[in-house]
Amino acid sequence: MVYLHVPFCRSFCTYCDFYSEIACRGRDAQSFELYAQALCAEASRRQDEIAATRDLNTLYVGGGTPSVLPPSLLRRMLASLTTGGVPPEPPASLRSGTEQQHGSFPEPFTEFTIEVNPEDIVEKGMDYVRELLALGVNRVSMGVQSLDDGILRWMNRRHVAARSRQAFGILREAGVRNISIDLIFGISQLSEAIFAETLREVLAWRPEHVSAYQLSIEGGSALAELVRQGRYSEAPQEQCAAQYRQLCDALRAAGYVHYEISNWALPGREAIHNSAYWSRHPYVGLGPAAHSFHDRVRSWNAYDGHPAGSETLSGEEEREEEIMLGLRTARGVADGRIDAAKAAAALSDGRLERAGDRLRIPEDRWFVSDDIIADLV
């Protein structure tokens, strides 16, 4: 189970504080090459760690904006994960665009997700998407965020709503059969009507998966500076809660399963890789600022991709983490993991409910789950 961080963006979104660098057109080839060399070297050093997590054979390429990279570099990085070297050219069936899993590499990934932006898909076209499929990509996560052009401009997104529509069509026509759409809610100027229209259209596309996140103000983001200057005020919690209910109601009516606080899927299309994070499965994170987890040790890279630090969790810290992550999901946590008195009180007042031999937060309380979880750890 591997996460690969691609730290490049064409521009920075208003709300984002993830580590990334501006990739300037015409001057990005050298930056991409240096990054690929460093990542391949890191993967080579960490082959034993990668092998130790292979019982769940998933790969997630996130960022940043992975879709700015050419497929040739992705192919080299994939080779460093699976063979330690550059693989041979893919067979003719893959070069022709036939969808395969993992191409010439020794083991197909059960799930291979790549994050893309709509404008890259439209600009690079169907041949680019088919190259991704030839590499083994079998799931695409696209950052739509909104279908309102005014909201997109405020976010400093490079695409307009029409690009998202085009990009989704290109992905489908190219043969992508597992698409996840990212949305954002909880923006002051996002009205109920605008959000309802975005939801209506996205659900009409029938993606296999939807992730929706409440806007948060992160310390290193441009949004934090806007707040400091008095140029933006957070949306009231009542507005955010109402939009979360809109999400839940619309997606439920459309047949999606609400399996994690911010994630919905058509039955059987839940994200395997991300679900493993919430169940605390070991994983290796490669690239600048990537995080890893194995044998009770959480570690993280510096911005240059080299190890920056680690911490070993105590038994009590593991229990608390299991509760915090598990209660974000519809599966919940095993009965007995939460202090008995706290669990009894939460069951009595409706903050928890039983689901077989497990305890979970009822869906209608998920919006306030942070407060509930804080009381239970």
Each predicted region: which residue ranges?
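C-terminal scaffold of the Radical SAM
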Residues: 1, 20-49, 55-87, 94, ...
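Local cysteine-cluster metal-coordination motifs and their immediate loop/turn environment
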Residues: 7-18
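N-terminal polybasic/positive-inside topogenic patches
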Residues: 96-99
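Short amphipathic alpha-helical interaction segments
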Residues: 337-348
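A short, conserved structural fragment
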Residues: 348-357
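Minor-groove-contacting beta-hairpin "wing" of winged helix-turn-helix DNA-binding domains
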Residues: 358-362
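Short, amphipathic alpha-helical interaction segments positioned at domain boundaries
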Residues: 366-377
